[in-house]
């Protein structure tokens, strides 16, 4: 009886099927090469995505300012919002309401390629928005221009 059990165990061990250590090392090496080649490209696209999100947030802030102050009596003549990487948007505390209403009061720049801040200035007399921003990917200066990708 005991001999039969050992014979069965011995047969099972001889019929083991699986990957050898060499095969596993080859697969890991191939995966490491693929990651090394593809990672820089992926990082570049992630950075562009962050900057595009920053631009969309700034456009939302500009639209919010236009909408809020188009109907507001006694609004200041000029409202300037500065969006940066390190601090929440800097504006006059009396004009903070439109950003709080839309949840944009804590918007910060997430892209790493911005040269500085994005300044958004709304002039109520003309109803125009002026952007001032610069990065490796995007630039804008002018009235009612969107922040556009560099060519």
Provide a role label for each language-model segment.
Residues 1-19:
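N-terminal leader/signal peptides at the extreme start of proteins
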Residues 16-42:
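N-terminal single-pass transmembrane signal-anchor helix
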Residues 25-28, 70, 85, 96, ...:
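Contiguous, function-dense segments enriched for cysteine-driven chemistry
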Residues 38, 45, 65:
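Conserved alpha-helical elements of the SDR catalytic core
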Residues 44-60:
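Aliphatic-rich helix starts adjacent to a transmembrane/signal segment
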Residues 63-83:
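Alpha-helix exit/C-cap motif
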Residues 84, 88-90, 105-151:
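Short, surface-exposed interaction loops/tails
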């Amino acid at each position: 009886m005991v001999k039969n059990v050992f014979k069965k165990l011995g047969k099972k061990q001889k019929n083991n099927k699986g990957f050898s250590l060499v095969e596993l090392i080859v697969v890991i090496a191939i995966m490491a090469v693929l990651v090394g080649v593809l990672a820089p490209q992926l990082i570049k696209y992630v950075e562009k995505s962050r900057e595009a999100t920053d631009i969309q947030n700034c456009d939302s802030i500009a639209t919010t300012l236009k909408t809020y102050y188009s109907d507001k009596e006694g609004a200041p003549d000029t409202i300037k919002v500065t969006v940066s990487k390190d601090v929440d948007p800097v504006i006059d505390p009396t004009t903070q309401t439109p950003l709080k209403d839309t949840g944009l009061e804590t918007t910060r720049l997430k892209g790493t390629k911005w040269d500085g801040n994005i300044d958004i200035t709304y002039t109520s007399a003309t109803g125009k928005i002026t952007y001032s921003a610069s990065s490796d990917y995007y630039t804008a200066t002018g009235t009612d221009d969107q922040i556009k990708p560099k060519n």
